[in-house]
């Protein structure tokens, strides 16, 4: 097991990374739990891992109850959030009751938002069970639900008490979900570590077959990079925005196609290539870098091109992006592979040229 610590102005917390950690969750997490916990999982993850977690909490003397939600991005909304609140209130959860998010990014985001708002703030713990959530969404305190007009538009910055990433849970992931998570892994190399990007190019076949050692290295490096960035910029006033590489285009894809039609990681993969193409148009990166990024994403079983839809739809969705400031769209681009930048776009013609092959 490896342990990282995330330091933020609000508080510091550990990330536990390793194999076989879920049966140890009670002892590992007990210092970060109250006397009572609410386990929130979805109907897919609960049959796989809920029993193991319940047994671990019983052994640690932590009382608990469970709330089971429908599965999928399409349910990341007010209605499902209210199911969490219903379960908490029906079980008389108090302000010190710890919410435990057992699942992927959708569960983690919703449980975090529920924790941020239930009785004006309850503690929560992340137990991510997908690659995407282990390397990205479980760390850093971004919580949210979707709105029909835009992804993650309603939420809060609210840090967990701890994160426990058991790599064994990745063995039950469908191949498509594993690929989707790999998009975020590749994103880290592209935005800030060319050495890691090159390592991914070398070891992608082993990663896609869940090589234990290589997978642990990749998850640890991603969490390390995110922890370093979050420590410097908890609420995304500056460099934390780099972590949104590909997300402005990607969120537009998810919104246009309907939440869950394209998995988040699939949309981010295509979005990263579009961000590189935009940087090419601005003279900031090379066609060779864009091709190299696309090739690595494709090696992970990911799309490197977006679906086709009207330019006006792209603009409509991107105008709702959370990085928009003073009506000006801000994109995360690349100076080169391994070095991100923040670019303001006032001339939509350059966006049209970037997207032209897909209109």
Swiss-Prot record:
Protein's cellular compartments? Cytoplasm
Q: In which pathway does it act?
A: Metabolic intermediate biosynthesis; chorismate biosynthesis; chorismate from D-erythrose 4-phosphate and phosphoenolpyruvate: step 2/7
> What InterPro entries does the record tag this protein with?
Dehydroquinate_synthase (IPR050071), DHQ_synth_AroB (IPR016037), DHQ_synth_fam (IPR030963), DHQS/DOIS_N (IPR030960), DHQS_C (IPR056179)
| Gene3D superfamilies (UniProt xref) | 3.40.50.1970, Dehydroquinate synthase-like - alpha domain (1.20.1090.10)
Name a biological process GO annotation: chorismate biosynthetic process
Question: Which cofactors does it use?
Answer: NAD(+); Co(2+); Zn(2+)
Q: Where does NAD(+) bind?
A: 71-76, 105-109, 129-130, 142, 151, 169-172
**What are its E.C. numbers?**
4.2.3.4
Mind naming one GO cellular-component term on file for this protein?
cytoplasm
Pfam families in alphabetical order: DHQ_synthase, DHQS_C
Q: Name one GO molecular function term.
A: 3-dehydroquinate synthase activity
Assign the protein's first listed, main location to one coarse class: cytoplasm
Which enzyme class, named as a word? Answer: lyase
Q: For this protein, what does the record note about how its cofactor is bound?
A: Binds 1 divalent metal cation per subunit. Can use either Co(2+) or Zn(2+).
Which HAMAP family does the record cross-reference, listed alphabetically? Answer: DHQ_synthase
This protein is called what?
3-dehydroquinate synthase
Q: Which organism is it from?
A: Neisseria meningitidis serogroup B (strain ATCC BAA-335 / MC58)
Question: Coding gene?
Answer: aroB
């Amino acid at each position: 097991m490896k342990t990282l610590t995330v330091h933020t102005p609000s508080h510091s917390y550990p990330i536990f990374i390793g194999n076989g950690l879920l049966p140890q969750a009670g002892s590992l997490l007990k210092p970060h739990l109250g006397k009572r916990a609410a386990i929130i999982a979805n109907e897919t993850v609960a049959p796989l891992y809920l029993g193991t977690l319940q047994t671990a909490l019983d052994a640690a003397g932590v009382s608990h109850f469970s709330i089971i939600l429908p599965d999928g991005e399409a349910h990341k909304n007010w209605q499902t959030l209210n199911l969490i609140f219903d379960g908490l209130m029906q079980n008389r959860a108090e302000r010190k009751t710890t919410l435990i998010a057992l699942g992927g990014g959708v569960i983690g985001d919703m449980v975090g938002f529920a924790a941020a708002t239930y009785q004006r703030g309850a503690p929560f713990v992340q137990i991510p069970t997908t690659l995407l959530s282990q390397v990205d969404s479980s760390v850093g305190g971004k919580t949210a639900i979707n709105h029909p007009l835009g992804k993650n538009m309603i939420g809060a910055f609210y840090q967990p008490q701890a994160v426990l990433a058991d790599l064994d849970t990745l063995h039950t992931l469908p191949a498509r979900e594993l690929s989707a998570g790999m998009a975020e892994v590749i994103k880290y190399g592209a935005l800030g570590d060319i050495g890691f990007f090159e390592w991914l190019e070398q070891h992608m076949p082993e990663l896609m077959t869940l090589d234990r050692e290589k997978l642990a290295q990749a998850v640890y490096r991603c969490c390390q990079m995110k922890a370093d960035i979050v420590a410097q910029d908890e609420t995304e006033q500056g460099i934390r925005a780099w972590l949104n590489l590909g997300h402005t285009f990607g969120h537009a894809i998810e919104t246009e196609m309907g939440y869950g039609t394209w998995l988040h990681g699939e949309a981010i993969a295509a979005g990263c290539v579009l961000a590189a193409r935009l940087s090419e148009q601005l003279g900031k990166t090379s066609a060779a870098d864009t091709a190299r990024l696309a090739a690595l994403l494709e090696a992970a079983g990911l799309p490197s091109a977006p679906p086709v839809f009207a330019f006006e739809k792209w603009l409509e969705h991107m105008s709702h992006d959370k990085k928009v400031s003073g009506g000006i769209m801000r994109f995360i681009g690349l100076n080169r592979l391994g070095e991100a930048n923040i670019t303001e776009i006032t001339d939509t013609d350059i966006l049209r040229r970037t997207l032209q092959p897909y209109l």
